[in-house]
Amino acid sequence: MHLPPQSFPLTRKRRNRKDDFSRRLMRETTLTAADFILPVFVCESEGKREAVPSMPGVYRLSIDQLLAECAELVALGIPAIAPFPVISAEYKSADAAAAYDPDGLIPRTVRAVKAAFPELGIMTDVALDPYTIHGQDGITDADGYILNDTTVATLIKQALCHADAGVDMVAPSDMMDGRIGAIRQALEANGHENVRIMAYSAKYASAYYGPFRDAVGSAANLGKADKRNYQMDPANSNEALHEIALDISEGADFVMVKPGMPYLDVLRRAKDQFAFPLAVYQVSGEYAMLSAAFANGWLDREAVIMETLLGFKRAGADIIITYFAKEAATMLTRG
């Protein structure tokens, strides 16, 4: 960007900031409800609405309760949800077979939501950690190391299971090598060419995921283990661009950076480099951190929510996956 020479007092940058109308006219970034995807936690039973202690205001919902929530989301103009399953211990195994059960929790959720709200998009998680006894995102060898290609074969089954149930978008969050291309080819071969893939391309081995693992019930299974041999090192950004480039070449329709706030630089670099549909996930730890500050009166809730979400979009995000989606959309409706 090359501007002609400017100097004070002929140029006064405050001039356009003086009144609301001119501030609005020169605003470079705006938020709408159409920018958001709401992550939701879905559980078995009926009439169940169970609070997640580490995420104030977030609940584990049975399918019937989720449908009531979806009615509100549609009315607010939120285009999509991302359901995550709360899987009980009896359905967890070393081979994660429940992940591709056609009568499992997620396929039933997809069918129920699509029957009631066909216009609402659904993006399902393709990963094995809710279904494994060890809480890792894949199938392990005797030493606990994730077997990449064996895991990808299981992820293909999971993605096809979700596609058969009627999902709009599958979102592989596992960080296995080659899984986007393998899933894309399987979808094409099985008549699901219009099922989109949201690739968790730059998913970091972050300390911000704790409340999510509590919510889905995988924290106890994972214990003190970590996921550093497949999720990305928080120190790296060039590697993120390599991962994103690979996923685009393998057939991803959207790519994602996760978490959000600590990785705005990666988000900006990704948008500048690829100009490709780009999502960011404001993860559970970010939500919990802000919620704690709000509860103590340390930050203005509405102002900080909107500033944070605006920051994601200004940094390059086209899509913001956030637990604040419903609240933010309500605020935007008020104007």
Model-based region annotation:
Residues 2-7, 19, 32-37, 44-335:
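Alpha/beta enzyme core
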